[in-house]
């Protein structure tokens, strides 16, 4: 299956433009889906409101999420855009990363101003590493102009509170419904043009995975007589070629080695790059010194850790999750990249227990260290079934 990052390279080739993943966030009924429909009408292949609202369900890491995917383009860029019909779907999508966002369009009603889900989505966007937010104040055609000014101030304060540059964030004022109805006024189609301009100018194109430091999660290890130890896996990012120094990280003490060969389907390659399933031959490394769950990485680019903070979503009973709540010191398995590791959960102040269907911040202490950095996604499993999903929001101890 093609990942979003691999797809980026293909999209640039297909459209001849840089690619950015965006999504709409914000409180229920503030107009996220109407705005999505309006953007497609003027910048893509039109997708009607009810088609977006009846988004098909996808399964990702054992969790079912309803997400609508649309695409559109400006003169400068190609955008893939995700919109979720329900609040629970937003929360799950942002944590599970079914559709990763480089930037979010925060939709706020000019009539109501920021509401509880507005806050929750901003906080989640920060926790899961969404880099940029552009604001669209909607329903301006039926709002008091003074009220719109207050809403903008409030939104900027809220963004600053949660770690975004509230003073710099672009704010566009308009009416998604007017734009959908082809209104030529300031709040109609012109507001969509302005929003697209702000996205183009404010949001930076993320680096492609192939330009990042090399990382390969180890899936299997073989010993080939006369040649040495081969590890296999899919290159998550970067490139590797013969002669490159690499580190083996996680589960035990970090080891240094050198790549003496890159193979794919029994063919020798000059180099392996992001997205490819390869075998890497390691110099002087014994079969028993390497195992599934470790990673190969460019030296000094990733370190092993046991303690971290995470933002998690716990599945409901109907989603195949737990039937009962859990309490502090609950010890499930954490499936990180290619392996399960047992860990203990600490609940943050004021939280006595976690119910199925909850979205919470937790602290985790794993029994063994795993190569990780902020933004790593994982599944929470119990007896082989997925009971939750999460994303690392902060590393708590440095080995």
From Swiss-Prot:
Residue segments, region G5: 175-177
GO molecular function: GTP binding; GTPase activity; guanosine tetraphosphate binding; translation elongation factor activity
Region: G1, residue numbers: 26-33
Domain of life from the UniProt record: Bacteria
Residues where Mg(2+) binds: 33
Reactions it catalyzes: GTP + H2O = GDP + phosphate + H(+)
Main EC class the enzyme belongs to: hydrolase
PROSITE patterns reported for this sequence: G_TR_1, G_TR_2
Region named G4: 138-141
Location (main, coarse): cytoplasm
Region (G3): 83-86
Binding site residues for GTP: 26-33, 83-87, 138-141
Gene3D superfamilies according to UniProt: P-loop containing nucleotide triphosphate hydrolases, Translation factors
Subcellular location: Cytoplasm
This protein's UniProt keywords: Cytoplasm, Elongation factor, GTP-binding, Hydrolase, Magnesium, Metal-binding, Nucleotide-binding, Protein biosynthesis
Residue numbers spanned by region G2: 62-66
EC number: 3.6.5.3
GO cellular component: cytoplasm
Domain (tr-type G): residue spans on this chain: 17-208
SUPFAM superfamilies, per the entry: EF-Tu/eEF-1alpha/eIF2-gamma C-terminal domain, P-loop containing nucleoside triphosphate hydrolases, Translation proteins
HAMAP family: EF_Tu_B (MF_00118_B)
Subunit structure: Monomer.
Annotated function: GTP hydrolase that promotes the GTP-dependent binding of aminoacyl-tRNA to the A-site of ribosomes during protein biosynthesis.
Family: Belongs to the TRAFAC class translation factor GTPase superfamily. Classic translation factor GTPase family. EF-Tu/EF-1A subfamily.
Name of the protein: Elongation factor Tu 1
Native organism taxonomy: Bacteria, Pseudomonadati, Pseudomonadota, Alphaproteobacteria, Rickettsiales
